[in-house]
Amino acid sequence: MSNHTQPKIAIIGYGSQGRAHALNLRDSGFDVTVGLRPGGPTEAKAQADGFTVVAPSEAVKSADLVAILTPDMVQKKLYEEVIAPNMKQGACLLFAHGLNVHFDMITPRADLDVVLVAPKGPGALVRREYEIGRGVPCIYAVYQDTSGKAEQFALTYAGGLGGARANIIKTTFKEETETDLFGEQAVLCGGASSLVQAGFEVLVEAGYQPEIAYYEVLHELKLIVDLFYEGGITRMLEFVSETAQYGDYVSGPRVIDAGTKARMKDVLTDIQNGTFTKNWVAEYDAGLPNYNKFKQADLEHPIEEVGKKLRAKMVWLNGQQQAAAAPANQQAA
């Protein structure tokens, strides 16, 4: 590492997280260079934000710390072909998600420190909280500590993002990867979206208006999740009616029962033993045939057409939609 108090940082990728990391770190006093493909979709945006933008192979050469903030499925090739041959001896390699390292798709050079720093929020929130003097909690991990300073570099980076203003928790690459995948699949994305679709179908098939069903099972979910976010499940229960509370107590366990929990454990097992990652890599390498089929099925679900019409009348959503982060498939370097 250089003798400077602050490490020279190369941010590879400029999607939602990449942009937030780069801006926050620069505002925290770090020397930040952004590495992007020449002519790529985010090059002009990074330049407009005032960053020096060079090819990733150039960006990593003089960097003390290289943060890989590109989508999971492009990281292996990026590391092997661009980063590993050009990254200087003894530098620190940083990830925001441990999938590639934990499941041995990337084997970092032995001379490198390898760490993980993951803000627990989307990029737009990471930036917004920093700008108003607060921060988003971060988790961090050390995979390889060649210099003896890897943990300090992770903490310094997390602090530069604003994480020290909130909370910084130590984890491992294994724990971060497996819990993150499980949360996405069983609860946050897979579990929640399937629950909402099923609830909508039950009401519509029973003869209720699709518009009413949409409001009851999807639109109002935000109100509940906001209460979860602010104070946990018990806070939510404090703010709903006694009728809703009683329904929660007696009907929730009928929907999410021991069988559901057992299947959630199966999902976790597939994550832990690498089955999910193996299948995902094979799917990606095959050109995403099933992924695209599943995606199209979601787009064609009746709840989407109903929701589109109803949201068009919710004028307060327009500003929020414009400010939303880009979809994951638009966040490549």
From Swiss-Prot:
Q: What Gene Ontology biological process does one annotation of this record name?
A: L-valine biosynthetic process
Question: Required co-factor?
Answer: Mg(2+)
PANTHER family assigned to the protein according to its UniProt record, in alphabetical order: KETOL-ACID REDUCTOISOMERASE, MITOCHONDRIAL
Binding positions for NADP(+)? 14-17, 37, 42, 72-75, 123
Q: What is this protein called?
A: Ketol-acid reductoisomerase (NADP(+))
UniProt similarity note: Belongs to the ketol-acid reductoisomerase family.
Against InterPro entries, the record matches this protein to: 6-PGluconate_DH-like_C_sf (IPR008927), KARI (IPR013023), KARI_C (IPR000506), KARI_N (IPR013116), KARI_prok (IPR014359), NAD(P)-bd_dom_sf (IPR036291)
Amino acids binding substrate: 241
Give the enzyme's main class according to its UniProt record, as a single word. Answer: oxidoreductase
The species this protein belongs to is: Xanthomonas axonopodis pv. citri (strain 306)
Alphabetically list the UniProt keywords: Amino-acid biosynthesis, Branched-chain amino acid biosynthesis, Magnesium, Metal-binding, NADP, Oxidoreductase
Q: Which residues does the Swiss-Prot or TrEMBL record annotate as the active site?
A: 97
| GO MF assignments | ketol-acid reductoisomerase activity; magnesium ion binding; NADP binding
Associated pathway = Amino-acid biosynthesis; L-isoleucine biosynthesis; L-isoleucine from 2-oxobutanoate: step 2/4; Amino-acid biosynthesis; L-valine biosynthesis; L-valine from pyruvate: step 2/4
Q: How is the cofactor bound?
A: Binds 2 magnesium ions per subunit.
Q: Which gene encodes it?
A: ilvC
